[in-house]
Structures are given as C-alpha cells and as structure tokens.
Curated annotation (Swiss-Prot):
Keyword DNA-binding among record annotations: no
Pfam families the record matches: GatB_N (PF02934), GatB_Yqey (PF02637)
GO molecular function per UniProt: asparaginyl-tRNA synthase (glutamine-hydrolyzing) activity; ATP binding; glutaminyl-tRNA synthase (glutamine-hydrolyzing) activity
Sorted UniProt keywords: ATP-binding, Ligase, Nucleotide-binding, Protein biosynthesis
Reaction catalysed by this enzyme: L-glutamyl-tRNA(Gln) + L-glutamine + ATP + H2O = L-glutaminyl-tRNA(Gln) + L-glutamate + ADP + phosphate + H(+); L-aspartyl-tRNA(Asn) + L-glutamine + ATP + H2O = L-asparaginyl-tRNA(Asn) + L-glutamate + ADP + phosphate + 2 H(+)
One BP term from GO: translation
Source taxonomy: Archaea, Methanobacteriati, Methanobacteriota, Methanomada group, Methanobacteria
Provenance organism: Methanosphaera stadtmanae (strain ATCC 43021 / DSM 3091 / JCM 11832 / MCB-3)
Family stated for the protein in its record: Belongs to the GatB/GatE family. GatB subfamily.
Name of the protein in its database record: Aspartyl/glutamyl-tRNA(Asn/Gln) amidotransferase subunit B
Length: 452
C-alpha cells in the first residue's frame, strides 16, 4: 500500500486571506461575515494577502523542517465549478515551503489557499461565512505503507500544529487521502475530517482495492467520497489532473518575495517542534520515549516539566506528571494550561511524597483537588487531613482494629483468598485517613494474619 495525504488546515488569523471580514464563521449566522470580495462580485478586488496568514504558513513549514521558497510567490487561480465557489476558481499560492519531513514521512510542499464556502446539499443553500478563510495545504509524499502509519503521522502533525499556535484546531482540519496498492491506480478520498476517519478510509480502501484485483478487475483512478455514518467510500468522479484545473496566475494579486531576514525572525521566535522536543527530553533527562511523548503532548505541559526538573529528579517528575497529572487532566477534560496547576505546585507535591508527609495513596486523592484550586498542595492536604506521618504504633492499632472488626475477611485469608488482605488494607487506610503506606500495611497485615 502507498498512501499520501493532502491536509488542509485553517490558519489562526482574525481576518480572512484577501479581505478584512472576521474569521469566526462557526458562531456567526449564515452569510453575515461576508463582503463583495468574499463573494467575488464584479469589480471587487482582493486585498493584498493577509500577512499573519503568510507568517503562520512559514512558521508551520519551518516546524516541519521545510526549506522556505526563495522564489517569487504567485497566487494562482484554480478553476472548478461547485456551488460553494462563487467565482468559479479558488486562489492558491505556489509552494511556500518544500522538502520537509515528519515521523519519517516526507513533506512535498506547503502552500496557502482560501477556503471555499459551505454548501448544504440537503437544503440547496450555501453559507459564504467560511469563504476566504486562510488555509495551508500540507502535501506529503506517498510514504505511508499502512493505515496505522497514516494515523501516527496525523497525530504527530496535530502536535506540531498545536505547538505552532498557527492553526485553528483539529476540528477545522480536512484531509484528502490518496491510496494505491500494487497493480492498481490511485484513488483519492476527499474531505475526510478526522484522524479516525482517515484511518477508516484507508482500512476500507485497502480491502476494496484488493478485492477488485483479486476478481481480475481494474482499480480506477477516481475521486471518492467518505460516508462517515457507514464508514465506506463511494465514487464521486474520475480523478482530475492539474491540467483540468486550468491554473493561471491571478492578475489581481501582485507576486510576493519572502524576505530571508523575516523568515529567520520567525524561526528565532517559534517554539521548539514537539517531535524534536521529545527526542531532546529522552537524551537530556534520560526518560522513556513514551513518557517524553506524553509530556510533550502540550507545549505548556512540556515547559512545566522542564521547570519541575530544576528542583526534583526528572524520572520522579515524569512518573507523577505522566500518571497522576495527566489522569486528572483527562478526567476534568481540560488542558494543562487551563488547570491553574503551576510547576511549583508539582514540585511541592513531589516533595510531600518524597518526605513521606503524604502517602502515594493520599497524593492520588490530593492531586484530584488541585485543578482550578488557588491553594497550595500543602494547604489542600491539611484541609483534607491527609498530611502527616503515622507512627508505627498507630498503624498497628489500626491493623488490629480492622482484623477484629472483619472476621469474615480473616477467615477468607485462612482459606486461601489473598484478596481478603486488600480489603483489610482498605480498612486500615480508612482508619488512618489515608496516611498509612499501602505497601507496608499490606506486608504487616499478612505477617499478623499468619501468626493467628
């Protein structure tokens, strides 16, 4: 199998690519964020390209390891007929970046283009609020050999885009999926709007094309549509070539030259790409690559990890942030940047655990109260009454009480049911308000029961 992707990503700008209309099309009533330029009305000339959009495109290209074009940048008219394209053509630039690489997949080119409107065939209406929103199209080489490789690439791309701050989010990403197998021609599946969808498309197309060849048929070069509700693809039309689009330079837009000094300024101010940060974390901090990928899943989380590592051991920090912190963030459905948990909070919690002021079990409960909380871990722990060292005598007394109050559990243990010990450990943790160490308590209970 050979798979290449054409990924369309909306850029994070306040205004459209060739006019000053706002870009908040998702929350606006239909056909309100429009002007004569958006609608390509006679006599309406486009503004010069939005500089913020061009800068965002350059930043993404740099973060994907692309060479920035030193050629003159033209905007071309790409002609095709569809209700969401009022002019009959789409403005798209020649490549801004070329020859990049991500996750072992070569990036052929990145260029800027305008989004068309939104056609609603069930109603026969078009909303032009989206028309003119700036996009980049990221075109890969056909380097992916399985649906899994394509899914991994897209996940990695999302991380890069999130780090860049240049994109409007995964929900605005659309991919055209190109797939062929040995002995067949290429099929293109248009406008797949999720990573899961791209994976399902490739799984379906792989089976469909193999079955055609197995029966002695011929796989057509065609454009197909993905029916998400049925998770299948269906024919749309025969695949177009570049000549079918009748590309010509747009006479209303002057050619552009990208200033190398401006590119260098963008390079100096952009964050370290996620995939490179992952590799550095492994080398610099000696942590596992899986942990590094979790910690670099958000730029702010990665920055927090580096701050925490200035105060505590990197592997200790990685374990707590990977397991406990990410668990709590996932449960609350928030990103680290939204949590109000600071690096100093994480350091304080780790120090409480390391000094045995709180047990791992108590810390498990404490961290659940930290998101959105302005109090320190120590203040939260004191309110929960889970901070403090329990003396051995107090633990022994709690063990004796748990055994005395639960004769059935004792009998179960004597009959070979080791899980009964876990129940008794839970009772001791309740009696000590979670201040006892579960592992040590488990060992002490077994020793006590074996003496009975």
């Amino acid at each position: 199998m050979m798979c290449g992707l054409e990924i369309h990503v909306q850029l994070n700008t306040n205004s459209k690519l060739f006019c000053s209309c706002p870009t908040n099309y998702q929350s606006a009533p239909n056909n309100t964020n429009i002007c004569p330029v958006c609608l390509n009305q006679p006599g309406a000339k486009p503004y010069p390209p939005n500089q913020a959009a061009l800068d965002n495109a350059i930043k993404v290209a740099l973060m994907l390891g692309c060479e920035i074009s030193n050629e003159v940048i033209y905007f071309m008219r790409k002609h095709y007929d569809y209700p969401d394209l009022s002019s009959g053509y789409q403005r798209t630039s020649v490549p801004v970046g070329i020859k990049g690489e991500l996750n072992g997949v070569r990036i052929h080119e990145i260029h800027v283009e305008e989004d068309p409107g939104q056609y609603k065939p069930d109603r026969g209406t078009v909303d032009f609020n989206r028309s003119g929103i700036p996009l980049i199209e990221i075109v890969t080489e056909p380097d992916m050999k399985s649906p899994e490789e394509a899914r991994n690439f897209l996940n990695e791309l999302i991380r890069v885009l999130n780090y860049s701050g240049s994109a409007r989010g995964e929900g605005t990403m659309r991919a055209d999926v190109n797939i062929s197998i040995e002995g067949g021609k290429r099929a293109e599946v248009k406008n797949v709007n999720s990573i899961r969808g791209a994976y399902k498309v490739l799984k379906f197309e792989l089976i469909r094309q193999k079955n055609i060849l197995r029966r002695g048929g011929e796989v057509q070069q065609e454009t197909r549509a993905y029916l998400e509700s049925q998770m299948i693809t269906v024919p749309m039309r025969l695949k177009e070539d570049a000549d079918d689009y009748r590309y010509i330079p747009d006479p209303d837009l002057p050619p552009l030259k990208i200033d190398p000094a401006h590119v260098e300024e963008i390079r100096q101010n952009m964050p370290e790409p996620a995939h490179l940060k992952t590799e550095r974390f492994v080398e610099e901090y000696g942590i596992d690559k899986k942990d590094a990928k979790v910690l670099t899943s958000e730029l702010e989380l990665a920055d927090a990890f580096e701050e925490v590592c200035k105060e505590v051991d990197a592997n200790v920090a990685a374990r707590l942030m990977r397991d406990e912190l990410k668990r709590v963030l996932h449960y609350n459905k928030i990103q680290y940047a939204e949590s109000k948990i600071t690096p100093s909070d994480i350091v304080e919690l780790i120090n409480l655990i390391e000094s045995k002021q709180v047990t791992p079990e108590a810390a498990h409960k404490l961290i659940e109260q930290m998101p959105g909380n302005d109090k320190t871990p120590t203040e939260i722990g004191n309110e929960m009454d889970i901070i403090g060292v329990v003396e051995d005598d107090a633990i022994v007394n709690a063990i004796n009480q748990a055994i005395e109050e639960n004769p059935n559990a004792v009998e179960d243990y004597k009959n070979g049911k080791d899980n009964a010990v876990n129940f008794l450990v839970g009772q001791v943790m309740r009696l000590t308000r979670g201040k006892a160490n579960a592992g040590e308590t488990n060992k002490m209970i077994k020793e006590k029961l074996d003496q009975l």
